[in-house]
């Protein structure tokens, strides 16, 4: 990504209210059961760790995390469809990992649908391991889908 960074203006910045319209577009285009505008605004208002990835001023991704003591829970991470499989998800994760180690976070965990093969592939390449399952966690057209719980140590 560093060679891309020299050519393109890539920014990892704090999520602001003015980003919400673009985030909602990505969210609705990516998920059958998207988060609402209120959820995103509540995350910003209640000091969740909310970041966006801008590429030449275009919002291409975002991540929302909860930081509690020495743990980081990734609650939502998404890359705009046309920008997937180009390294932006990896870049976003790596920036998050670097940043949270400054807050003494040692463990990062998240939930992922087993059906989200591309996300699972990214997380596993980035050192996440499956540590559990949450039964019937995600709404799905046929009822509910389990969630895989993935975790990574970012600081020993």
For each feature predicted by the language model, list its residue ranges.
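Acetyl-CoA-dependent GNAT
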Residues: 4-7, 11-84, 93-95, 99, ...
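C-terminal "cap" of GNAT-fold acetyltransferases
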Residues: 7, 113-116, 136-156
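Conserved G/P- and acidic residue-centered "switch" motifs that form tight phosphate/ATP-binding loops
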Residues: 57, 87, 116
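Glycine-rich acetyl-CoA-binding "A-motif" of GNAT/NAT acetyltransferases
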Residues: 58-61, 118, 144
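Short beta-strand "wing" residues that participate in macromolecule-binding interfaces
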Residues: 65, 130-131
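Residues forming the Rossmann-fold NAD(P)(H) cofactor-binding site
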Residues: 90
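Conserved GNAT acetyl-CoA-binding A-motif
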Residues: 100-111, 122
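Conserved active-site tyrosine of GNAT-family acetyltransferases
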Residues: 123, 128, 150
């Amino acid at each position: 990504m560093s060679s891309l960074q020299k050519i393109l203006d890539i920014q990892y910045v704090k999520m602001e209210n003015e980003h919400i319209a673009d985030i909602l577009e990505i969210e609705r285009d990516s998920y059958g059961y998207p988060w609402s505008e209120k959820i995103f605004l509540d995350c910003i208002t209640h000091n969740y760790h909310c970041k966006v990835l801008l590429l030449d001023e275009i919002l291409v991704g975002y991540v929302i995390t909860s930081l509690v003591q020495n743990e980081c829970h990734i609650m939502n991470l998404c890359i705009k469809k046309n920008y997937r499989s180009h390294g932006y998800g990896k870049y976003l994760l790596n920036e998050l990992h670097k940043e949270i180690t400054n807050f003494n976070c040692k463990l990062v965990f998240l939930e992922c649908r087993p059906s989200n093969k591309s996300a699972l592939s990214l997380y596993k390449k980035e050192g996440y391991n499956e540590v559990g399952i949450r039964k019937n966690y995600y709404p799905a057209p046929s009822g509910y889908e389990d969630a895989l719980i993935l975790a990574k140590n970012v600081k020993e």
